C-alpha cells in the first residue's frame, strides 16, 4: 500500500435471524478501509478498499475461520478477522484502528474479554490480532451503530448485502442508511 501509514478500518456483521442460530443461518461480514478519517462520522477520508463475504460455517470449506453458526457475533468476529488478514498483506502501514459497533467483537478480538461462545473463531481472531500487532500499532474503537456514521454505515451495507447474497451498491450510488 502506498502513501498510507495510518488507516481506519470499519467492520460490521449482519445476520438474518439472531435467535436459534444454526450452521445454516445466513450471516455476512464487511469492512472498509479509510485513509484520512477524522473519526467523527461525517465521511471524511478516502475509501482505499472494501471487502465482504458470507460467514463460513463448514469446517471443510475454503475460508472457514472457526465459526460454527451464522450469527451476528460470528459475523462481527469474521469481519475483524478478514480485516486483519487484509492488513497483514499491506506494506507500509504503521498504525491501524479497527472501528466497529460491536463492543463484544472488539473486546474478544483484542483479548480484553474471554470468549464463552464462538471459541474456535475467537481463538483464530485473537491469533490474527496478535500477529498483526507484531507488525504495526493496532487498536480497536467502538462506534455507535445506526447513527449515521458514514463509514460504519458503509460496513453495515457491505455486511447486509453479503448476508443477502447480493452485490453491494457502488460507493457513488450509495448513501448512509441504505442497506
Task: Describe the residue ranges of each PLM region.
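RNase H-like nuclease fold core
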Residues: 1-74, 85-86
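Loop-to-helix element that buttresses phosphate recognition and phosphoryl-transfer chemistry
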Residues: 75, 79
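RNase H catalytic domain
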Residues: 15-20, 62-66, 80-160, 171-172
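Acidic two-metal-ion nuclease catalytic site recognized across multiple nuclease folds
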Residues: 166-179
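Acidic/proline-rich low-complexity IDRs
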Residues: 6, 46-47, 135-137, 170
Amino acid at each position: 500500500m502506498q502513501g498510507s501509514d495510518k488507516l481506519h478500518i470499519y467492520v460490521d456483521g449482519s445476520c438474518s435471524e439472531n435467535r436459534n442460530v444454526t450452521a445454516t443461518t445466513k450471516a455476512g461480514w464487511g469492512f472498509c478501509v479509510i485513509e484520512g478519517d477524522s473519526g467523527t462520522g461525517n465521511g471524511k477520508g478516502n475509501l482505499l478498499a472494501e471487502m465482504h463475504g458470507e460467514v463460513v460455517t463448514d469446517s471443510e470449506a475454503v475460508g472457514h475461520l472457526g465459526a460454527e453458526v451464522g450469527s451476528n457475533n460470528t459475523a462481527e468476529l469474521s469481519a475483524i478477522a478478514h480485516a486483519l488478514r487484509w492488513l497483514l498483506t499491506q506494506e507500509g502501514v504503521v498504525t491501524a484502528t479497527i472501528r466497529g459497533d460491536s463492543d463484544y467483537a472488539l473486546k474478544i478480538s483484542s483479548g480484553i474479554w474471554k470468549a464463552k461462545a464462538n471459541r474456535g473463531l475467537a481463538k483464530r481472531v485473537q491469533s490474527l490480532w496478535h500477529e498483526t500487532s507484531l507488525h504495526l500499532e493496532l487498536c480497536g474503537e467502538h462506534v455507535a451503530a445506526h447513527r449515521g456514521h458514514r463509514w460504519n454505515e458503509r460496513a453495515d451495507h457491505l455486511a447486509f448485502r453479503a448476508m443477502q447474497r447480493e452485490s453491494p451498491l457502488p460507493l457513488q450510488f450509495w448513501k448512509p442508511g441504505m442497506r
